[in-house]
Amino acid sequence: MSKKTGTKKKQTKHKEKQQGFNDLLIPMLLILCIMPFIVRLALYSCGYAKYPWYSDEDVIMDLYSYYRCYFFEVVAIFTAAVLAFRSGLFPENRKKMKIFIPLAVYAGMILLSTLLSVNMGASFTGNFYQFQGVLVLLGYLVFCLYAYQVMEQEKDYKTIWYGIVAVFIVMAVLGIFQIAKKDLLDFAWMQRLVMSKEQFAEYGGTLETIFSGNNVFLSLYNPNYAGVFLTMFAPVFAVMCSSEKEKKKKIFYGILCAGCLILIWFTYSRSTFFALLVALVVGSILSKEKIGKLMKYILPGILILAVVFVGIDKINDFHYLSRWKEDTPKTKLERMITSKDGVELCYDGKEYLITLEDKKAKIYDKKGRETDIKKVEYSAKMAIAEYDEEKYIDVYLCNQTFTFGKNSKGYYYRTENGKETQLTDIPKVDAGGKEYLGSGRIYIWSRTLPILKKYIVAGSGPDTFAEVFPQNDYVGKAIYANNPARVIEKPHNDYLMQWVQNGFLALVAMIAFYVLLLKKCGTFYYKRELSDIKTRLGLGCYLGCICYMAGSLFNDSTLYTTPVFWIFAGIALASAYEVEK
């Protein structure tokens, strides 16, 4: 048999296989439809006990990330092997990959940052609720390339569409329970499913979500993550509904879209509406219809939705709308550091020095005059107390207790975990006292920006943000995070996280791919006739990617949302490539 004949037979078998269910889609379906529901209790050590800002007890309970991470890594490794095998077996079916060059650079910088990581173990395996180690980050890219390469036939797009519908319906059921304040994890029978017998005997009935009320977080740990997840699905449903000709299907898709928007509302995540607005603008520009004609439908639709959602929020005591009003921290504390001479305090523009002399706490003004604390006027409650048996001072500020001690080297801060450390001036960008905005995001960004210059070439390593962020900013965290002991494990901005953990060059490479994705698909879908499922699903996935990229200004990359983004990106590119070919 000649080589040419053998190749033709391979092609024939390959085409026959594609006419039925394409089993190459199984890895994508596992990630889209199965992984979001992996919930299992795990106990692990984060390794932070060595730091003064963390407790000596560093064993953490995790329900949502630990096993999900390993599931994703196993599937990603298998997917990479299948992709390599397929490319070797059917080289003639391999699509052009020039657009993926920036991702190759991005992958290289991730590997370099891992090798130079401040915590190589965490960068390899993942850590501290995130679990996005090097294998996970590279796995994202594998799935993007895989989706791009294997999505070929009309049936492939239908299969993925059915998977999207199925996962959303299950998520919607979870969301309905949560809106009714009856999360399934509150039930003992469900807790038995997500724990071992030994764990249930110890922890059963004690699991509590960290979100009160009826916040929708689905099976994704955090309402913000649920919001990002749902904003990627909403454009898909909207495109499928608006382009559907069959009346029954159109109604069904409309119900899916409306349900998705309702669930988004109950996440109470403000960034989701920014992301949806960006996608709406882009979708309107790409539409075949003239903008003026579209506005006749869009504006009334927005008005109706606004009335409906405000009505729902009124019934819910304006839970959502109240979040748009940021509460300014009621404190005038500006600075507090420890020194050899005492605790230096700047409050309401006035400087003071607190000392411990003969087991008695004393306070002096800027000129060195002793002042009675009761005679000092403060807008917030402040008091000083000393222990008779221990050389400690308690300072009550910002509704927090700061404990200070004195030894031969001077004064030190005693953390809530009983560790001794210093309060120092923290490098920061002046935010004009607006650090509280965005649920404290401005505070985190103002402390993150000064450390960016350290990570131009390589970053600190995957999953190490918590270890390089100035966690010793106890005063700042007391004011803007309500707890000086809180660990800031992410910047709430994926672009900042990429820069810190993977380096500036990695961020540039990632953004370069985003630009190519926007340009390639934007050009292709501009005024495109939505006559087949692959074009419709491709456009929906493209707009979903835009939602993710816009939302990433206020949210981080996570195992709960990012796999969907990269698969959607591959689908959008595959759809554009399919018809173009």
Where are these regions (language model features)?
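Membrane-helix interface linkers and caps
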Residues: 87-96
